[in-house]
Amino acid sequence: NSYVYLYGDMDMEQKLMELDENYLGDYDKIEMDSHIDYQQNFSKPVIVHKDYPIASEESIESKTYLSCNYVVGRALDLKQNVAFGILDQVLLNSSGAPLRQALVDADIATEVCGGFDDGTLQPTFSIYLKGSEEKYLDIFQEIIRTTLLQQVHDGIDSLALQGIINVLEFRFREADFGNYPKGLIYGLQLLDGWLYDKDQPFGHLHMLQILSELKEKITKGYFEELITKYLLDNSHTSIVILHPKQGLNTIEENLLKEKLATYKASLSSKEVEVIVEDTKHLKEYQSTPSTQEELATIPMLSRNDLRREVLCFQNMRTTKDGVE
């Protein structure tokens, strides 16, 4: 259950030796079947109704969540996943995004959310409403379909696509990950492919090549084809309705108490005593402060470990339509 990677300018052989001597050398490699099966495609969209808890005195009006969710390809299809990340921004999560704007204008919810998630074996694209009502479900679905059909028919705004690609390209070139160390982000990106194919850990680092290919496809109908295939003509879809339910927490707590009482009744007095003693020892361990000797084993930073130079922020000067 461990994935180890090294990042930086270092003596790799020395670091691997340290890993072996201090950590991994004490264990034997075992083969584990961590294969994850793909979920079979649905023959038709699946509708799911679930309850979620609200306070007993809280109003249930405009507290329903509605969502449409689409399974979109596979985790190792890197180009398609990057393309859907771009569509996420262009359609839903940028200023003036047509799908978001159409749903906001319909005034059927207090908030429009959603996006693309490629952190699983089968990535998903979701659109959901917060603060809505079940009676708006048909309108919700119709707005999604009508807006997407219009985007396919008229063509997605090429400048919007180009703009998002430029932003992604700039971030990758500059390794601009905010306050997060770039080595950490690179490692997390490796896992997007590495988790599902041990022979493909580096695919997500070829971002510039992928973005270059996607630039060429902006005016060739590629993005519109993705919308048609995965959002308009895709039966591997779920519609989820979350209903507010007053007092649900109390109901679930009572069910848990009944379950625990039944379990306790099935135990012998000796088994109960063991659980009580284990709990007592755990609480003692948690409440006992660490000794000075134990605290001294925690690695500490010195002033020499801190960088004296401040972060360098770069400004880019461009000219557009004669305006600098």
Task: Go through the PLM ranges and name each one.
Residues P45-A55, F172-D176:
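Short, low-order "capping/linker" segments at domain edges
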Residues N1-F42, E61-D77, A83, Q89-R307:
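Charge-rich, well-structured scaffold segments of protease-associated domains
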Residues P53-E57, T291-V323:
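Edge strands and adjacent loops of beta-rich recognition modules
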Residues E111, V323-E324:
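Non-catalytic regulatory/linker segments of enzymes
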